[in-house]
UniProtKB/Swiss-Prot annotation:
Name under which the protein is recorded: Heat shock protein 82
Pfam families, per the entry: HSP90
GO molecular function: ATP binding; ATP hydrolysis activity; ATP-dependent protein folding chaperone; unfolded protein binding
Biological processes per GO annotation: cellular response to heat; protein folding; protein stabilization
Location of this chain's protein in the cell: Cytoplasm
Entry remark concerning the domains of this protein: The TPR repeat-binding motif mediates interaction with TPR repeat-containing proteins.
Binding residue positions for ATP: 172
Motif TPR repeat-binding, chain ranges: 495-499
Length: 499
């Protein structure tokens, strides 16, 4: 296709030509040698045209598309790049961005890389062979499915690489000396990231790019440890302070409060699901910005991206969230409240048993009565949801990664204060046990977990509704007979305490 000399093909071409009926009849009139008088209608009919097919032969240039990567970038117009991109990829749209460069030194090669405007529908299809980068040696096409040439997460980048230094064996299909390929790969990744940063200079273009290929960038953060920090600069997220716009990690750092050491984030199913999460109550009140990471792949990316610009990334839903900005007086009040709620924490733990690892007084919630947090190194509620959805999941792994939950209670909440009073008055109060179980199940939902037994939860809610509506107790008793057990006996509770 890109041979330097022209290649022509002798082709047959069929064209349609219009001729009038008069032209067709002229020879006949000459032969007859007589002139006839005709009326106007016949004259109009003769004025009509008919089509005939003409066959012609000509030489057609086959290799019209010249190897533009051999020319200087400043000499090539935007239209030439667009034409080359369309011929290379069979795309009907123009490209979003282009990077034309040459590398010189121990290894020399020239390349043109393109970013398309939209992602192909089979971008993450594992059965599809990667054929986005075409490899040429001295302008002779060698292969387009060389997996060593570019990492999988950059599978959407299209382009051409042409090197005079690549040695080939007889079959032309197997490349020798992988060291050369590694050098080319390293340079291609570097230039791709440069190209993405150039796109980021135009907000409108970058929004299109990010919408189409943000998953690829996050996959790169998970897989490419060498370029993780550079790829992190390209990430964009909604946050508690960004409104409808998305913010970069770099901009987040510039807006950090004085004395703030960490970058706070929350993961979840959607922006709507996390923006009113109980985990954000104290952070919002204190004026801290929190990033909303609501893409499933964010869980994997943030698992590898431990820090950015020297700032640790801290999840708002896990243990280890410390906000050391309280005055000495506030700290003293908190300690007093923790002591007064110690007994309630023990009672709740006895009622819930193995469902939670421990019950503590919370520092992170302001309005909600309670929430459930996970271990610092375990799965978040969102990650647990993602792993449950895996068709081929490893159940043995999920048993220890979905670590025991810690229940955090809010001492300033009216429900908790009333519960504390009732529990102190009578530890075995039936209503206390029912309320604790109901609070635990609602905390599961608000914290992003799923219920193991939704029917029991629904039955408990219905029971509360009956009490609120003052429905006949006899009718209620009939309903309760069919309901699953909501509480333990006093003896069972004592046995757990001994254990």
């Amino acid at each position: 296709e890109f041979i330097s000399y022209p290649i022509y093909l002798w082709t047959e071409k069929t064209t349609e030509k219009e001729i009038s009926d008069d032209e067709d009849d002229e020879p006949k009139k000459d032969e007859e040698g007589a002139v006839e008088e005709v009326d106007e209608d016949k004259e109009k009919e003769k004025g009509k045209k008919k089509k005939i097919k003409e066959v012609s032969h000509e030489w057609q240039l086959i290799n019209k598309q010249k190897p533009i990567w051999l020319r200087k970038p400043e000499e090539i117009t935007k239209d030439e790049y667009a034409s080359f991109y369309k011929s290379l990829t069979n795309d009907w749209e123009e490209h979003l961005a282009v990077k034309h460069f040459s590398v010189e030194g121990q290894l020399e090669f020239k390349a043109i890389l393109f970013v398309p405007k939209r992602a192909p529908f089979d971008l993450f299809d594992t059965r599809k062979k990667m054929n986005n980068i075409k490899l040429y040696v001295r302008r002779v096409f060698i292969m387009d499915n060389c997996e060593e040439l570019i990492p999988e997460y950059l599978g959407f980048v299209k382009g051409v690489v042409d090197s005079d230094d690549l040695p080939l064996n007889i079959s032309r299909e197997m490349l020798q000396q992988n060291k050369i390929l590694k050098v080319i790969r390293k340079n291609l990744v570097k230039k791709c990231i440069e190209m993405f940063n150039e796109i980021a200079e135009n907000k409108e273009d970058y929004n299109k790019f990010y919408e189409a290929f943000s998953k690829n960038l996050k996959l790169g953060i998970h897989e490419d440890s060498q370029n993780r920090a550079k790829l992190a600069d390209l990430l964009r997220y909604h946050s508690t302070k960004s409104g409808d716009e998305m913010t970069s990690l770099k901009d987040y750092v510039t807006r950090m409060k004085e004395g703030q050491k960490d970058i706070y984030y929350i993961t979840g199913e959607s922006k709507k699901a996390v923006e009113n999460s109980p985990f954000l109550e104290r952070l919002k009140k204190k004026g801290y910005e929190v990033l909303y990471m609501v893409d499933a792949i964010d869980e994997y990316a943030v698992g590898q991206l431990k820090e950015y610009d020297g700032k640790k990334l801290v999840s708002a839903t896990k243990e280890g969230l410390k906000l050391d900005d309280d005055s000495e007086e506030e700290k003293k009040k908190k300690e007093e409240k923790k002591k007064s709620f110690e007994n309630l924490c023990k009672i709740i733990k006895d009622i819930l048993g193995d469902k939670v690892e421990k019950v503590v007084v919370s520092d992170r919630i302001v309005d909600s009565p309670c929430c459930l947090v996970t271990g610092e190194y375990g799965w978040t509620a969102n990650m647990e949801r993602i792993m449950k959805a895996q068709a081929l999941r490893d159940s043995s792994m999920s048993s220890y990664m979905s670590s025991k939950k810690t229940m955090e209670i809010n001492p300033d909440n009216g429900i908790m204060e009333e519960l504390r009073k009732r529990a102190e008055a009578d530890k075995n109060d039936k209503s206390v046990k029912d309320l604790v179980l109901l609070l635990f199940e609602t905390a599961l939902l608000t914290s992003g977990f799923s219920l193991d037994d939704p029917n029991t939860f629904a039955a408990r809610i219905h029971r509360m509704l009956k009490l609120g509506l003052s429905i006949d107790e006899e009718e209620e008793a009939v309903e309760d007979a069919d309901m699953p057990a909501l509480e333990e006996t006093g003896e069972e509770s004592k046995m757990e305490e001994v254990d």
